[in-house]
From Swiss-Prot:
Record's keyword annotation contains Ribosomal protein: yes
SUPFAM superfamilies (alphabetical): Ribosomal protein L6
Organism, as annotated: Anaeromyxobacter dehalogenans (strain 2CP-C)
GO MF: rRNA binding; structural constituent of ribosome
Known function: This protein binds to the 23S rRNA, and is important in its secondary structure. It is located near the subunit interface in the base of the L7/L12 stalk, and near the tRNA binding site of the peptidyltransferase center.
GO CC field: cytosolic large ribosomal subunit
Protein name according to UniProt: Large ribosomal subunit protein uL6
Lineage: Bacteria, Pseudomonadati, Myxococcota, Myxococcia, Myxococcales
UniProt family annotation: Belongs to the universal ribosomal protein uL6 family.
Keywords from the named record: Ribonucleoprotein, Ribosomal protein, RNA-binding, rRNA-binding
Gene from which this protein is expressed: rplF
Keyword field contains Ribonucleoprotein: yes
InterPro entries tied to this protein: Ribosomal_uL6-like, Ribosomal_uL6-like_a/b-dom_sf, Ribosomal_uL6_a/b-dom, Ribosomal_uL6_bac-type, Ribosomal_uL6_CS
């Protein structure tokens, strides 16, 4: 039995969970989300708890058991608290600006870079326009969006210019030494 998968997940107040075939739907104060589950795993809702069970003892089903339980837990946490990820923009003249569902970046290219936010993701920039905070109820979508934003201009190791996660440390390199 999966140690993670066998533990039931308590449903918080003001949250509705429903299972429709292989789709789990979660609604809460911050929003709603749904995700598919594998047919090898079944999800049941009873007495304020969500329980995950696997259909057989195959290697794949054992792996999906714990995964599905964690996805349910993340969905419940997301619709109650929400998730956020911070990004920092380093470099002379590098900045970001949120306009509706788009983020406009000035990243040292000859043109501005426009990034369209996916549905269910919001962003805000601080007053200096160098700290970007991305928020969503879907942890997976939030991580994907943050990674795509970082890929617009990843930090380089010599000066550290670029977009990095707020909690990320960049391994710096020394420049060339003088010619001998």
């Amino acid at each position: 039995m999966s140690r993670v998968g066998k533990m039931p997940v308590k449903i918080p107040e003001k949250v509705k969970v429903s299972v429709d075939g292989n789709v789990v739907k979660v609604e809460g104060p911050k929003g709603k989300m749904h995700f598919p589950t594998n047919p090898l795993v079944s999800v049941q809702v009873d007495k304020g708890e969500v329980k995950v069970a696997r259909q057989d003892e195959s290697h794949v089903a054992k792996g999906l058991h714990g995964l599905t339980r964690t996805l349910v837990k993340n969905a419940l946490e997301g619709v109650v608290k929400g998730y956020e990820k911070g990004l920092e923009i380093n470099g002379v003249g590098f900045k970001a600006e949120v306009k509706g569902k788009e983020i406009h970046f000035t990243l040292g290219f000859s043109h501005p870079v426009v990034f369209k936010l996916p549905e269910g993701v919001t962003a805000e920039v601080d007053a200096k326009q160098t700290k970007l905070t991305i928020r969503s109820v879907d942890k997976h979508l939030l991580g994907l969006t943050a990674a795509k934003v970082r890929d617009l201009r990843p930090p380089e190791p010599y000066k550290g210019k670029g977009i990095k996660y707020a909690d990320e440390t960049i391994r710096r390199k020394e420049g060339k030494t003088g010619a001998a």
